[in-house]
Amino acid sequence: MRILLIYMLGLSGIACASSIKEIVKESREKLEKGLGYKLSSSEIRMLRRLFEKNAGLETRVVIPVILHQSKVVVSPGTRYRDIEEGERKYVEKVIKLLPEVAWRSITHIYALANNDWAVDLMYDVFDKASSWRSDTVALYKGTEKKYGMKFTDLVNGIFEQNNCILKEFGRLLADRVEILIQELPGSLDDVEKKREEEVLRKIKEYGRRLCTKEKQDEIIKAQRIMCNVCEYIWKREEDRKSFIMEVYSTYLKLREMESNVDEIEEPLIYFVDHRGLINACDKYKSMDIMAELILQLFLQGKNIDDKSIKSAVRSVRERKRLEEMREMEERKRREEERAKNEEELLRMVEREKREESKGRGKKKGGKRGAGEAKEESKEEDRKEEEGVEVEEEESAEVPLVETVVGGARRKKKGSREKKMGEEHHYKVHSRVLRWKKDAEKIKRELDKGSEERWKGKSVEEIKEQKKVHDIVEVSELLRDKEKCDRFFVRTGKYMKGGSERWKMVANGILEEGGEKKVGKVEVGLFKGGRGESVVYHLMFRPTETERTGMVGGSSFGEGDDVDEIKKEKSSDMSGFRYPSGVRCEMTSNGNEFRIEYRNRKNTSEVLRTLTILRIPEIL
């Protein structure tokens, strides 16, 4: 939430105000208009702390990815020649904006004054340097002899160019802030004046640091690490899918805030502690650990600190341990198979020797014996051929077991049977199905249940929870493995309450009463007693806040808030259907799966709509 608030403010162009109180008020109004709801008191306090403690000086990096609608048109390692012909015009438009985006990521601050002098200063210094700045599009395209550079190389080069004018900007910023400190109005009380002065001194100190080579090198190194890590993440399919899903989620949120635009025509800026990023890289010198750290920042909303770094190190070591175990098992399997083949070969050699010896003995017995041997040999050959046919035929009838959605298992039909779309069989736990009931009945069940956090909630609170939990129709999308893989990303497995658990996560938009919320559709699963997968958790979680739920944390985070699951309380939903037109209508066009929940008494009235979005296609 903290990162998202600053992110929204940075891109929506908050004007400067004369005091922290005014800038918080101005920011609050803009955010509430964009988010479509009133900020809670805790969110307002968070907003105030952001300006008091940080003054908008948190360090940022550019994510080396370009999105267009629901597609990734440029990835970290993309060269210009790799871009689809139909997307090149759009990409060139974005590339032209890159120098400004990179500059804004370093110099955009929230200053306190009666005008937006800080923004003017930022653009004045940038515009003066336009005469000697390279043509970024031409640079990216390359020449006939050269095939052009990777997108990450272009981004890094632009940051290096911008560093040439940082010293001038830092000097002008520090000088201007010193004047503002002297001109603080006498009408402010001592407490407010001290607070304003502290914020301005932080900005002044930041300006002075920008003049130093140490700070300039830090900015370049942090961005270079980010580019290298993103390129590394892109090589691993599961990490790539979850990474791009989170980038796309932020992209969707910005589009919802800027409701008057269809596209965000620039790469995204993300808030990362430069010094923490560099220290972690220098200490561990491991791309695996850095990739895991960045994924945790993106997927779980963590900051770079000792806790998150240790978590990344543990995750990498555990993954390597499991990989080594799998490699050992594979080596053992290959050795056993080789020994088996050698044993079979020895048996074949011995059999051939016996047959040769037997053949020589029968030849000594006369012509009849030779003829019998020949007929016997033919008969054996015929039986062996028939035996192969029978064996192959029988093996075709033996059902094969294949791991499908969420680790569940199903039988794969033999080659003789008609091939059908791969379907996932699973069960749905009663704690998911209960949200179909009326709020009053749900409340009675929860008050009598074993989950303490749900006890004592009002009917109104339950009604709000029902909006984000009563989405069992999502199960329809999970049945088809191919469709499911296009929409959902699987997280790693973990143990809790004596059961093996995992999640599947997709991007979604919930619409109700003219209000749209971007968030994640979460599916929590555990392995049942017979090895089947059981859905025990299903909800839509808005990304901008946890205010709709009594559950916190990230959709991608390992772990959940359900301590123990009563495994016997689940139902086989493989044949479940709501009566057509009574509760909801489901449609899909390949890129989105849409569920319209309707008034049971008047089915023409749409109460709410949940749209699950496909993972962005990578061109």
UniProtKB/Swiss-Prot annotation:
This is UPF0329 protein ECU08_2070. Transmembrane segments: none annotated. Coiled coil: none annotated. Pfam families: DUF1609 (PF07753), DUF3654 (PF12376). Residues 350-359, 369-385 have a biased composition (Basic and acidic residues). Disulfide bonds: none annotated. It comes from the Eukaryota.
